Amino acid sequence: MNILFALHRLFWAAADWLYPPHCAGCGHHGERFCASCLAQVVLITDARCAFCGDKTSDGSSVCMKCNRNSVSFNAAASWAVYGGELRKAIHALKYRQDMALGAFFATFLIATIEKQGWNFDLVIPIPLSPDRMKERGYNQSELLSRPIAFYFQVPHSSMALIRIKDTGTQVNHTKIERDLMLKDTFYANPDKLNGRKVLLVDDIITTGSTINHCAKALKEAGTSEVYALSIAKTLKKDHRCSDETNKS
């Protein structure tokens, strides 16, 4: 842990001391995400397919059913299963400006990275469209990705990958529909990416379409490896009801 990461955590700890938070899960006063809600989180301890969410027998990030030539990322992992109190907390991070949750969840993502043993030299958040960024005022994925970059002491870039097409909401769309919506949506800057090993950070992986299209753009721009990471992963039965950010 380096000084930037320590200062980042200290900043949010001081903010919580000055303005005690309410739990983003149950509303309990005094904690950002209380121990009771944290205990209810279903951790992902086995390898799961980034597309359908099923367990993979060989420990890979894509199951045999979803294994296709169009898979562009090298590996993907999520900390927990999307649902319950965690779903409420991610909603607070994205839509209620509870930005301190970014630093909170980043600590669990760091542990996930260390478990995976990935080697990367650039951290990139999944980008929002200019309109969505203007509306929200911040990118929730960047609140996760920056402390990760601080911790591992690698560069961070929110401009190496940008969204150039407004796709509108992805909620209630299937993977096939999302793939069509996301085609040619992302642009990766070759000047910032040649030969890089990228860690791509998002809040939720639902059908895997977003991370796959981002990875495709990054690989076409010269990135050598792409690893995708998220707080949560939806299981296949939840794909249509997920409130995954319409990252437009």
Regions found by a protein language model. Name each.
Residues 1-202, 206-248:
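Glycine-rich phosphate/pyrophosphate-handling loop used in enzymes and phosphotransfer proteins
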